[in-house]
Each structure stands twice: as structure tokens, then as C-alpha cells.
């Protein structure tokens, strides 16, 4: 049995943020996550916060115009009044996907209830927010830029440990696929399903040591949970699926730019544009 805390990195998830200008991450779900309109403020509350309404209008324009594969649409929030941002957070709520990007300038990203609309926060120190914006995209551009910015190819020894079952062949296959991907990126991921292989604890340890840990961790919440983590090897991701009781049910490695489980589709974007129209109408 794998518990909730074992699949979340330190400082990521419920209880990791204060209230002021921070994103609040929801507890791990126990059942199917479906769209629920967030608790909206009364229209009269917005009368004194026209900036929040203006930001929603800009977001509507961005959602309507954006197409998957294009440059993401960014709406800066740094100079906006805190009261308006608080209302905006209330209106947009929290969606299925949360992302942490490590490094000297950590980044926390929370998808809103509108799939493909991301609230991005740059942080320093103990979580002080030094920059934030809304981004309309399949996944924020910063995630793509930093996932493998400092990745390196592992150096294999002449011999492998004697106690391995399948880690050696799996690693060779992964590295060959990753090098092909680096030369000629393919939209189709190369997937190895470890759940179907005899794979010992020694295999897991050896593979983890060789691939290393990357800076990006994604938690996607739907029916159960999906944890996606970049490795320190170019193009290789660990993608793990857990059921509603946190039991690991599928353990895979993917060679791809970004696993599709982390991304919004064009259908999601179009649906979010319609939902935002409904929300704005309810606020009139």
C-alpha cells in the first residue's frame, strides 16, 4: 500500500501553503473528480472590483483564441490589487492538476476549474510569491522549458549488478528511445509498462539511480491519482497511476516531451471557454 505522503514531494500538496497570495492544494480525492462550479461571489461584491471582471474578460478572449500547439496566452497578475486577485481565485477555483517545478526559483502551478487555465506562481525562500500569472495552454511553457534543462545522459558501467532481473534491458531500451526522441521528436510516446514485467526492488533502485530525479512533479487528480515526474535523463518521465485507495495500479516510463496525462486537450480548452461564459453570465 502506498500512502498519500509517499507520492508527494516535500512542500507539495495539502497544508504546504499559507493563506496570503498562496495557492491552496486540495486533499487527495477518493472518488471521481468532476467539474463543479466554484462558489461565486455575489454580483454586488464585484461592483467595487472592476479589475477582477476585466481579468475575466481578458481570460475569455485568451481561451477563445488559443489553439493547442500555439504559443500560450499569458495574463500578468503582479500589479493587480490583492483583493481583486482573491476574488479571481474564488471564481476560478482549483482543478485536477497541480505542478511543482524545483530549482533555485521554485514554481507552483495550479490548474483552475477551467481545464487549460493555469495559475502560475514563482516563489523564493519559504514560499514567498515574487511573480504570478494566468496562462492558457495545454501545459505552461515554463514546464516544457525546465523539465530537462539540466538533464544528462547516465554513464553505464561495463557490468551490471548480479541481482537485477529486467532493469538492464529496460534501461537500454529507454536510452535508445530517448536518443531517438532527442534527434527526431515524435508525438507518439515510447512507453514501457513496468507493471507487466518481473521487476524487483533492486531493479527499481538501480533504474532510479541511473535515471535520476528531475525538477518537475505533476499530480493529476481524476479517478484516483496520477503522479508524473521528470527524470534527470532527457525525455524520460515516470508515470504512475494510483486507485482511490492510493494503491499503485500502473507503473510506466514514457519517452516524450510531456506526458499527455498532464496536458489539456483542445476539447478541454473549448469547454473551458464555454464554462467561463456561463460563469461571467452568472456574475452579471
Curated annotation (Swiss-Prot):
Residues 1-23 are annotated as: Disordered. Transmembrane segments: none annotated. Belongs to the HupH/HyaF family. This is Hydrogenase expression/formation protein HupQ.
